[in-house]
UniProtKB/Swiss-Prot annotation:
Residues 1-20 are annotated as: Disordered. It comes from the Eukaryota. Pathway: Protein modification; protein glycosylation. The modification Phosphoserine is found at residue 9. Its cofactor is Mg(2+); Mn(2+); Ca(2+). Mn(2+) binds at residue 120. GO terms for molecular function: dolichyl-phosphate beta-D-mannosyltransferase activity; dolichyl-phosphate-mannose-protein mannosyltransferase activity; metal ion binding. Belongs to the glycosyltransferase 2 family. This is Dolichol-phosphate mannosyltransferase subunit 1. GO terms for cellular component: endoplasmic reticulum membrane. GDP-alpha-D-mannose binds at residues 32, 34, 36, 63, 65, 118-120, 147, 234, 240. It comes from Bos taurus. SUPFAM superfamilies: Nucleotide-diphospho-sugar transferases. It holds the Pfam family Glycos_transf_2.
Length: 260
């Protein structure tokens, strides 16, 4: 009995009261970027607007991987405009992968919650207050945006890409049974310590990395809440999804199926 009480008093089991945001809560938004010069000012402005209106404490950490289009210069200007207490540029010299970008960002994050999202305007910051409310209502370890539940959806894709996405998600649901409706989405809120542990367990790269994060979360018995979101295809620049990514996705899916 005493052992059980001690276990429940450990950091893993301590939870805030449901439905309440603590004054100490801070949300660190990680924005990995590569060639996002046009999109970055818009997404940062929308983030600042959303957090200012909702009243949540926040910081935005930009992790630029040596973009040749001047993304770093834009980020430096944004840091000056909004202040280094809100915008932190933490660049790297070259592309080193999404997982390592999150690790790099978390080293500089002072929040106890981490929000990950795309910097290309595919994910609208207006959903962040819903993520936070959902997390507090259920004391979830993770809250994931979903395109495949409720009033969630995808806009700006042609029919072919929508079909590929639906089929890929259907296959992953059958093979992996993840307990979440959208495995490949990258708009999520994590408890910081949960994200740190999951990244330490994951070995995948690219788009499969997001899938593995949810699969490992299920294995570790972390709780996952979902919020329907509208995903909009990138406004500026070219999509980074191509034939090589699709092949990597299929290989990664089979690897996860065989090892989880």
């Amino acid at each position: 009995m005493a052992a059980e009480e001690a276990s429940r008093s450990s950091p893993r089991f301590r939870r805030e009261p449901k439905g309440r945001v603590s004054r100490q809560d801070k949300y660190s938004v990680l924005l990995p970027t590569y060639n996002e010069r046009e999109n970055l000012p818009f997404i940062v402005w929308l983030l600042v607007k959303s957090f200012s209106e909702s009243g949540f404490n926040y910081e935005i950490i930009i992790i630029d991987d040596g973009s040749p289009d001047g993304t770093r210069d834009v980020a430096e200007q944004l840091e000056k405009i909004y202040g280094s207490d809100r915008i932190l540029l933490r660049p790297r010299e070259k592309k080193l992968g999404l997982g390592t970008a999150y690790i790099h960002g978390m080293k500089h994050a002072t929040g106890n919650y981490i929000i990950i999202m795309d910097a290309d305007l595919s994910h609208h910051p207006k959903f962040i207050p819903e993520f936070i409310r959902k997390q507090k209502e259920g004391n979830f370890d993770i809250v994931s945006g979903t395109r495949y539940k409720g009033n969630g959806g995808v806009y700006g894709w042609d029919l072919k890409r929508k079909i590929i996405s639906r089929v890929a998600n259907f296959i992953t649901q059958i093979l992996l049974r993840p307990g979440a409706s959208d495995l490949t989405g990258s708009f999520r809120l994590y408890r910081k310590e949960v994200l740190q542990k999951l990244i330490g367990k994951c070995i995948s790269k690219g788009y499969v990395f997001q899938m593995e994060m949810i699969v490992r979360a299920r294995q570790l018995n972390y709780t996952i809440g979902e919020v329907p979101i509208s995903f909009v295809d990138r406004v500026y620049g070219e999509s980074k999804l191509g034939g090589n990514e699709i092949v990597s996705f299929l290989k990664g899916l089979l690897t996860l199926f065989a090892t989880t």
